């Protein structure tokens, strides 16, 4: 593990810095110099018709301003006084019997970058104090995230709109601490991807490889997964968000291992996500057709990475990836026509139907992307990130090519579009399934910093897959 990451993470999560960033964004959006930010953590929730608790996932905006993973907590930030207060649950004697002593206010003050820690019983009194201290104080909260017992009546004005926007826009640019968390999530997840490739030689089912990935992540400190992982053997890789992860890796017809394994998985480290995709041959060596498609996707990714720096339009990077795909598929004879004609007609969408990437942070599809799902151009409809890349933003770069009959058949059946695809040549590639390569990179002023260390050079992949 990177020792420089350990050094950064030895300090406190910079909640106070984040609170100032959000307050500054509120001011930039025209909402004055004073006021109180109010946020609640996620509540403890029970499984329906059961006495067990649902899996807990902290509200991201609350964590951003507190660094606190506890449920049933609150925070206030007095913008004018620059004072951040965390409110945590008091001791419940019945709970102590089962769960042990909770975190005390003094312990919380040592752990978190806040100015004061009080009991949740003190929230309303503290809110009333802010109002009495200065007439006309305004409170900023998020609609539908305020408990019924909380009262804002003493405040002259309550704003339920701007805080969510301000927090989500502030979260786009990551500080050094956040980048360290993302780097650690990538370090661990990359180790897990390597473990999966090595384990595949003896594995007989997709679920065995999922188990290997999760176990490796947990052993290094990622107790949660960033999202439901994808372990897609053979043609299952043609389904973008394949979910079953329980199919045999041996083809029942031939009795041999399926061609490829697509793994899209990332561990979550202290609420920050990795999102990595790799493809490897289950036999230890790519088939000729698989290698041809892999090489095109790798070129799509490498040329995209070369374009990345602050100020670049993401749509331009995405468009370039489509052009690389078109040139590659033309060379193989799968497509017919000119590059420009195929680009204008959107034929590459039949094989590359999703966006090139998205922002990454506490959420896998992180805030600030501004997608336009109403876009009439099929190449951009599912692009989750639009506009200029921000310096300090973290993006995924995940081009792919898929041989999915459900997507491609309508193109083949179209009198207008079918002429651009050679069905006879295409026939050789259905068994490839899908190839996607995904790295997580920090956008810098003059380029990028790739956080992902999992191997992707095909010769390295084959060596790992073939085993000793």
From Swiss-Prot:
Enzyme Commission (EC) number: 3.4.11.9
Binding site for Mn(2+) 1: 275, 398, 438
InterPro entries: Aminopep_P_N (IPR007865), Creatin/AminoP/Spt16_N (IPR029149), Creatinase/aminopeptidase-like (IPR036005), Pept_M24 (IPR000994), X-Pro_dipept-like (IPR052433)
Domain of life, source organism: Eukaryota
A biological process term (GO) from this entry: proteolysis
Top class in the EC scheme: hydrolase
Catalytic reaction annotation: Release of any N-terminal amino acid, including proline, that is linked to proline, even from a dipeptide or tripeptide
Keywords carried by this UniProt record: Aminopeptidase, Hydrolase, Manganese, Metal-binding, Metalloprotease, Protease
Database matches in CDD domains: Prolidase
Binding site for Mn(2+) 2: 264, 275, 438
Cofactor, how bound (note): Binds 2 manganese ions per subunit.
Tagged with keyword Glycoprotein: no
Disulfide bonds: none
Similarity comment: family membership: Belongs to the peptidase M24B family.
Function of the molecule: Catalyzes the removal of a penultimate prolyl residue from the N-termini of peptides.
Name by which UniProt lists this protein: Probable Xaa-Pro aminopeptidase PEPP
Source organism of this protein record: Blastomyces gilchristii (strain SLH14081) (Blastomyces dermatitidis)
Gene name per UniProt: PEPP
